């Protein structure tokens, strides 16, 4: 949920020293993520009452609404550059989620799909491609960054 949280935060006012956003395997919304997991993991069809129950539980136990866990608005108003990573074999968050975030993003952006990588394994699967993508991003948007 880290990548999606960062993407959601990008729609808010952030400190001046935040030069860009890096999102590895982020989903668009908690609703879309739940629907994907219900279908792919448990072979359940779309059942609105399940979403409603989960939303109620989120409000009671975690004090937030599932509607709040959505990157759509942030991607429309964010002005900071975003580097999206996603593994082509991610079985937890479908790669289409990063593609949708990329398409909605109005800021400078780049999408890197790492072939064969599973969830959060992009750097492990193709380190050189991952590392070079990061270097190019930092060089372009944060020239003062020190990268070892």
Please name every model-derived segment:
Residues 1-8, 92:
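Glycine-rich nucleophile elbow surrounding the catalytic serine of serine-hydrolase chemistry
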Residues 102-120:
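Catalytic histidine neighborhood in serine/cysteine hydrolases
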Residues 77-79, 84-86, 90:
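Short beta-strand/loop motif that positions the catalytic acidic residue
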Residues 117-131:
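Catalytic histidine-centered segment of alpha/beta-hydrolase-like enzymes
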């Amino acid at each position: 949920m880290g990548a999606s949280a960062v993407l959601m935060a990008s729609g808010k006012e952030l400190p001046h020293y935040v030069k860009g956003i890096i999102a590895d395997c982020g989903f668009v919304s908690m609703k879309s993520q739940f629907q994907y997991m219900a279908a792919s993991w448990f072979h359940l069809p779309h059942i609105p009452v399940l979403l409603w129950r989960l939303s109620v539980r989120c409000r009671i136990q975690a004090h937030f609404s599932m509607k709040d866990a959505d990157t759509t608005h942030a991607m429309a108003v964010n002005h900071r550059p975003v580097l999206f990573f996603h593994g082509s074999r991610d079985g937890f968050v479908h790669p289409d989620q990063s593609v949708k975030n990329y398409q909605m993003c109005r800021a400078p952006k780049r999408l890197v799909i790492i072939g064969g990588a599973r969830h959060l394994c992009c750097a492990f699967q193709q380190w050189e491609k991952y590392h070079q993508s990061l270097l190019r991003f930092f060089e372009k948007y944060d020239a003062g960054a020190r990268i070892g």
